[in-house]
């Protein structure tokens, strides 16, 4: 079943085949239950619409992934460019990507929430634990896992952009002063709340450096604000993903409990059989003892005559 979660982005036919294969393997985990793994025409119709929804979500997540990759490449370009005009263009493209990612991420969140509600409502026609229900639940979990991985990629990229800018300021400060900046100086430069006197004096000597640094600082601040807004969107989505993670843990716990119940039932049956054998043994010995006593009595009566 876990394999299905990592393979949930296959084509319609492949998804259907993988769902059947993975659920057949689940019989090893849930022995004693007899599931029908052949999809009926009604199952096919139900899953057909479901897989179309999955494909829509899949496409959106792939687009977000590509935008994140483009965002990473644009960030690399900002570190090497010396033109303020090019830097402004890169900033605008990065902000455009961030806005698009935010919009698509919100759409994915809404679609997954809707899909979850439909999965629950679908149990009125296809009971919980049925082949269709297990397929829908497992593939939905796979979508959530993919979304969580994409969110992790964004968080890593966000931290890398901030770290790169911090190192850039630190390097400029050292070139201007010959000293390493203190944490307080770094925070002032990053926040824009103040500046370091030695660095300012250096820029006064080279005003073109002042212009470039100011332009870069404004560009990075704009990008930071956009990244923080997107970060908040992903934080809201994290609640959705982590809640499902708790549910998955509950499912695993239920499977473990089911295994313990099966094991306990097997042990109880074993002890019951042992007790049954012991009871039969006691009945046999009592019967033999009764026969012996009867024989002794008969022999005694015959001897007394």
Curated annotation (Swiss-Prot):
Q: The t-SNARE coiled-coil homology domain covers which part of the protein?
A: 210-272
Q: What does this protein do?
A: Vesicle trafficking protein that functions in the secretory pathway.
Q: Where is the signal peptide?
A: none
What PANTHER family does the database record attribute to this sequence? SYNTAXIN, SYNTAXIN-112
By sequence similarity, the record places it as follows: Belongs to the syntaxin family.
Share what the entry says about its subunit structure, partners included.
Part of the t-SNARE complex.
**Which sequence positions carry the modification called N-acetylmethionine?**
1
Superkingdom of this protein's organism: Eukaryota
UniProt keyword Protein transport present: yes
Recite the UniProt keywords alphabetically. Answer: Acetylation, Coiled coil, Protein transport, Transport
Instruction: Please list the coiled coil stretches.
Output: 52-119
Q: Name one GO molecular function term.
A: SNAP receptor activity
Species source reads Arabidopsis thaliana
Q: Write out the GO cellular component annotations.
A: membrane; nucleus
Name of this protein: Syntaxin-112
Q: List GO BP terms, alphabetically.
A: intracellular protein transport; vesicle-mediated transport
């Amino acid at each position: 079943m876990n394999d299905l979660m990592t393979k949930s982005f296959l084509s319609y036919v492949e998804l259907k085949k993988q769902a059947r294969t993975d659920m057949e393997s689940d019989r090893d985990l849930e022995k004693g239950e007899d599931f029908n793994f052949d999809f009926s025409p009604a199952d096919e119709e139900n899953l057909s619409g479901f897989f179309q929804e999955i494909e829509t979500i899949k496409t959106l997540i792939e687009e977000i992934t590509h935008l994140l990759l483009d965002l990473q490449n644009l960030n690399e370009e900002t570190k090497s460019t010396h033109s303020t005009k090019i830097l402004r263009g890169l900033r605008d493209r990065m902000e455009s990507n961030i806005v698009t990612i935010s919009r698509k991420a919100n759409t994915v969140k809404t679609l997954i929430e809707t899909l979850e509600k439909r999965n629950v409502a679908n149990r009125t026609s296809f009971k919980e634990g049925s082949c269709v229900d297990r397929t829908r639940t497992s593939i939905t979990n796979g979508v959530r896992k993919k979304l969580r991985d994409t969110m992790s990629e964004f968080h890593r990229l966000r931290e890398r952009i901030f770290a790169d800018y911090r190192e850039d300021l630190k390097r400029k400060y050292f070139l201007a002063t010959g000293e390493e900046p203190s944490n307080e100086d770094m925070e002032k430069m990053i926040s824009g709340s103040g500046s370091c006197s030695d660095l300012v004096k250096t820029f006064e000597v080279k005003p073109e450096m002042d212009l470039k640094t100011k332009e870069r600082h404004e560009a990075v601040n704009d990008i930071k604000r956009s990244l923080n807004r997107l970060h908040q969107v992903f934080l809201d989505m994290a609640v959705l993903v982590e809640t499902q993670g708790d549910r998955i843990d509950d499912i695993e716990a239920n499977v473990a409990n089911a295994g313990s119940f099966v094991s306990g039932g097997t042990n109880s049956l074993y002890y019951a059989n042992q007790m049954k054998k012991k009871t039969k043994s006691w009945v046999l010995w009592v019967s033999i003892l009764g026969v012996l006593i009867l024989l002794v009595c008969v022999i005694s009566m015959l001897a007394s005559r």
